[in-house]
Regions:
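Active-site-adjacent betaalpha module
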Residues: 1-18, 27-28, 55, 59-63, ...
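A short alpha/beta connector and helix-capping loop motif
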Residues: 15-17, 32-60, 64-71
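N-terminal nucleotide-binding beta1-loop-alpha1 segment
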Residues: 22-23
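Short, well-ordered beta-to-alpha junction loops that form the rim of enzyme active sites
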Residues: 70-73, 162
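Short catalytic/ligand-binding loop motif for oxyanion handling, primarily in non-cytosolic enzymes
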Residues: 75-79
Length: 231
């Protein structure tokens, strides 16, 4: 039996909706070897993810939507971990993924792999966007994303990010469990591949079952504009 059921369309409320982004960092978007970018380079280009992500950021900023961003950072003290990670965690630990010197000392941070992607800084560092504490493995359990959303009385989120089937999906699942309505933007995300298949396709299959909405960037932008006009 093929699952074809459709839930009622998710309706946006300007005051209760936020754009939630995950991993807006050089590690994922900057064209460098030896970084996560290599795993998703083709997927980023195929779906024009960088341009679509900026469209979402620009729209949310101009229309006054809350923007929340969950970065991925590791500090030298995280090397004290002795619990083994899975395949992707083990791999990333070996390539210096999203490494920072210290939570407070910013020496060496600017323009590093862990820094925000330069074209997005005008949105992420505008003084209004909330950059949460970092997530450590995949989801929100180690950061304050849910707290930040709750304190703004946000009920609905529009989500995007480069690691569709890993960090982004983990955030999505956590927010659904926490009681938020969630719409995923299908062409503002990327995914890596392994011998089992395509991570992007795996994410789309799961999101079709779980998310309240699965939209293109154009659809998301139009819905955000309509809700802002109606407010």
């Amino acid at each position: 039996m093929l699952f074809t059921h459709r839930n009622p369309e998710m309706e946006l409320d300007h005051k209760r909706t936020a754009l939630v982004l995950v991993d807006m960092q050089n590690e994922f978007f900057e064209e460098k070897t030896g970084t996560y970018y290599e795993l998703i380079a083709d997927s980023l280009k195929e779906r024009n993810v960088i341009s679509h992500t900026e469209q979402l950021l620009k729209t949310a900023q101009e229309l006054g939507y809350y923007i929340l961003h969950s970065p991925h950072w590791y500090y030298p003290t995280d090397l004290q971990w002795v619990v083994p990670g899975g395949a992707i965690a083990h791999y990333l630990g070996g390539i210096g993924f999203c490494g920072r010197k210290d939570p407070v000392d910013l020496e060496g941070f600017a323009h590093s792999r862990a820094d925000y992607y330069e074209p997005f800084k005008k949105y992420l560092m505008d003084g209004r966007t909330c950059n949460t504490s970092p997530h450590k493995h995949f989801g929100t359990m180690a950061n304050d994303m849910v707290k930040q959303l709750r304190m703004r009385k946000v009920e609905k989120v529009i989500m995007a990010g480069p690691a569709s089937n890993i960090c982004l999906e983990s955030h999505m699942r956590d927010l659904i469990e926490a009681g938020f309505e969630v719409a995923m933007v299908r062409d503002a995300v990327a995914g890596p591949k392994n011998e089992e298949g395509d991570g992007y396709v795996a994410a789309m299959v799961n999101w079709r079952f779980m998310a309240n909405g699965l939209w293109t960037t154009e659809e998301a932008v139009n819905k955000m504009k309509a809700a802002a006009t109606a407010a």
